[in-house]
């Protein structure tokens, strides 16, 4: 069982498996500092290639820098991988996130990620969040300039609305959109539908609701048991069937959990099974998860 079973989607000119890996959880508590078990993290990252995972998503604010450094240490020179990173957020303290979309700050973020990841050009650089205190056109303009100069291969957006996507498209081709989305929290449904219409990959972060959907007491547990799979696999399988444009990026520091997540790529839900999981999600109380 490998991630290839989920199929692929084109991110610009790059084909990626639709079950990827989110590297936010490679850090310590509060997405700050080093992980508690560095050996487990390295084992997890080293297992990605053998499991067919080809897309890895990180950010300079994870750690900060810790996640990018660990990805580089385990995967460089990235043969067979598309490595995406993000910039535009800064970290005042654990669990805290602040935007900094000043053009000079965004340029510094890209230059820093190039150095930290050890590459001459970033496969995919995503604006982590549009800074409401800086004109969006100024943020988009410097990103477009960096792409033209060869620092960035493809540009993506994160935590955005449909109008923001359209504003960005005036400056550059939007290669991907990354928003919070899972079977319970579907506030980004209009964004997903817009991406489908445009043929833009939609990267679903927190696909397991920071672990709540994968827990033994998950609201999906009874339905998953009937299917002979784990609750987390049910959540991921629902996402992968929801749209061929969705890329799910569950994260973990545990090699066993990684294998469990990847096995979800081979789960083939019937239309009835998909509808049942959807009904459960709609009945559930909305899980209010943070949006870094």
Question: Which role fits each region the language model picked out?
Answer:
Residues 114-132:
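Active-site groove signature of glycoside hydrolases
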Residues 3, 130-292:
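Beta/alpha (TIM)-barrel catalytic core signal, keyed to glycine-rich beta->alpha loops juxtaposed to Asp/Glu
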Residues 21, 58, 85, 124-127, ...:
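Conserved beta-strand positions
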Residues 53, 119-122, 152, 174:
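A structural motif
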């Amino acid at each position: 069982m490998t991630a290839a079973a989920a199929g692929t989607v084109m991110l610009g000119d790059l084909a990626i498996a639709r079950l990827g890996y989110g590297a936010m959880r490679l850090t310590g508590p509060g997405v700050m500092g080093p992980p508690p078990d560095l050996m487990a993290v390295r084992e997890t990252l080293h297992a990605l290639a053998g499991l067919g995972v080809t897309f890895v998503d990180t950010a300079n604010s994870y750690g900060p820098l810790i996640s990018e450094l660990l990805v580089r240490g385990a995967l460089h020179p990235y043969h067979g991988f598309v490595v995406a990173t993000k910039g535009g957020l800064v970290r005042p303290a654990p669990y805290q996130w602040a935007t900094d979309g000043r053009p000079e700050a965004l340029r510094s973020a890209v230059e820093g990620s190039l150095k930290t990841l050890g590459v001459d050009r970033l496969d995919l650089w995503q604006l982590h969040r549009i800074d409401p205190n800086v004109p969006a056109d100024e943020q988009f303009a410097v990103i477009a300039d960096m792409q033209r100069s060869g620092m960035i291969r493809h540009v993506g957006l994160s935590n955005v609305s449909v109008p923001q996507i359209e504003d960005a498209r005036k400056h550059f081709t939007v290669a991907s959109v990354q928003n919070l989305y899972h079977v319970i929290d579907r506030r980004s449904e209009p964004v997903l539908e817009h991406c489908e219409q445009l043929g833009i990959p939609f990267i679903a972060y927190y696909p397991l609701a920071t672990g709540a959907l994968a827990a033994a007491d998950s609201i999906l547990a009874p339905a998953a048991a009937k299917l002979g799979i784990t609750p987390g696999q049910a959540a991921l399988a629902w996402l992968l069937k929801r749209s061929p444009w969705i890329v799910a990026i569950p994260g973990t520091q545990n090699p066993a959990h990684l294998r469990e997540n990847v096995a979800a790529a081979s789960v083939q839900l019937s239309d009835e099974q998909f509808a049942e999981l959807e009904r459960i999600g709609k009945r559930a109380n909305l899980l209010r998860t943070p949006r870094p």
